[in-house]
Amino acid sequence: MKRWILYIIISAVAVVLFFESCAVTSYQRSGQLPVDGLFRPVTNIDTTQNIATISFHDFYNDPLLQQLITEALDSNYNIQLAVNRLAQMSQYLQQSKAAFLPTLDIGLSGSVSDVSKYGNSVRPENPYTELQLIATARWEADIWGKLSSAKRSQQAQYFQQEATVRATQTQIVADIASAYYQLITLDRQRSVTEKNIKSYTDYLQTVEDLKKSAQVTEVAVLQAKSQLAYANAYLPQIDASIAIEENYISLLLGKAPEHISRSSDIDLTRFHSEDLTVGVPAQLLSNRPDVQAAEYALRSAHEQFNVARAAMYPQLTLSGSVGPDAKGLANWFNMPGSLLWNAVAGLTQPILNGRTLKTQKEVAKLQEDAALISFKQSLLNAGNEVSNALASIHFTAQQAKYQIEQVEELKKAFEYSKELLVNGYGTYLDVLSAQNSVLSSELSLYSTYNIIIQQKIILYRALGGGWK
């Protein structure tokens, strides 16, 4: 008999050791992540520092823009929704921690019964009454780490949502800055257009004077009036774009559309320099909130696989109930005679369940693989955004240098053509052509400045800046 008991103990230990070898595994970051060479520099850049580590107050040094960003971080509805979901994740995390504790239920029941007067049973003098107040407890032992894995999975989901909040903040900061500088650009383009309208008006007066002296015909006057109307037509287009940008900023601020105050003395030409500090690609892992969120999603999926695998192992549960059970309330307190209790220890091993547990485990593994793919893709996306922004800044800055030269030469050509016309050596067509070229080239130059500014905003966000 003792030998059989020894065999049972040895077998039980062997089973435990077997399942222990299949127990949960901790998350390890893959060594095959595409980190090196994530972005492609197009010029010599400073990798010893990273603009992503700069707070948005230092990166965007315009006080009015800083005020708008601060207001948006407090009132933007997308950020509020992300924070709300974070609070939900916090509740689920608390629930996962409480799973280690036993459950406790208390039930109160009462019954009254009697028998028929005309049946075979002896009818008691009074109806039979019974009262029960039972407390039932149940506890699952976390011998395979299922509950621990579930808690770690929930922790990862909480941190994932926390990173999502930061990612939302960086996007809102970038959106506010982008729209703000778009407004500044539109203001400059409107100013340029108004200045050119003044020039068109002066030219019209010159042509009318020349017509009086028979140096030009009515055709020249009509052409000058046409070009003045052409220049004036730009203003409503610009005003419409300004209104749209102001409405968009108001939306980001959680407000109804309203006028947006902005600086009028910003020198946009200072933005076309290529003085950039981007750090090293590996820093994207610690700076980019969306990359962090993708890795936390992978951590959660890994722990969910542990949960699904542990569900296939034996489950040890302890349960019990205790409470008074008596015919009447007065008998409740006749303890211990009135007490009803039981205690149960159970070890349950799933055998046949319609492949439910195996399917859950296989699907959980596939979901972990999918999360790893998404994590790798998020890294590539981040590197691609940085590479695109660097390329755009570099080549657009070169373009701006030539456009500055173009504007200066066209202004000279316009002045020379006017002098030639007044002195009888040029034609009004030369003047109109030069005048149109000046207007279009100046508008185009400010659009180029805006592209550089927008790409620097994108680069700052792409490197992970904006949430500190």
Model-based region annotation:
Residues 223, 286, 433:
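Phosphate-coordinating loops and pocket residues in cytosolic domains that bind phosphorylated ligands
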Residues 82-96, 168, 174-194, 202, ...:
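Amphipathic alpha-helical coiled-coil segments
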Residues 214, 253-255, 314, 424, ...:
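Short helix-capping/hinge motifs at transmembrane helix termini and TM-loop junctions
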Residues 63-64, 68-71, 80-83, 90, ...:
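Small/polar-residue-enriched beta-strand and adjacent coil segments characteristic
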Residues 2-10, 14-74, 239-286, 329, ...:
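Terminal intrinsically disordered/low-complexity segments used for targeting and assembly
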Residues 147, 156, 163-280, 392, ...:
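Periplasmic alpha-helical coiled-coil/stalk elements that build and connect Gram-negative outer-membrane
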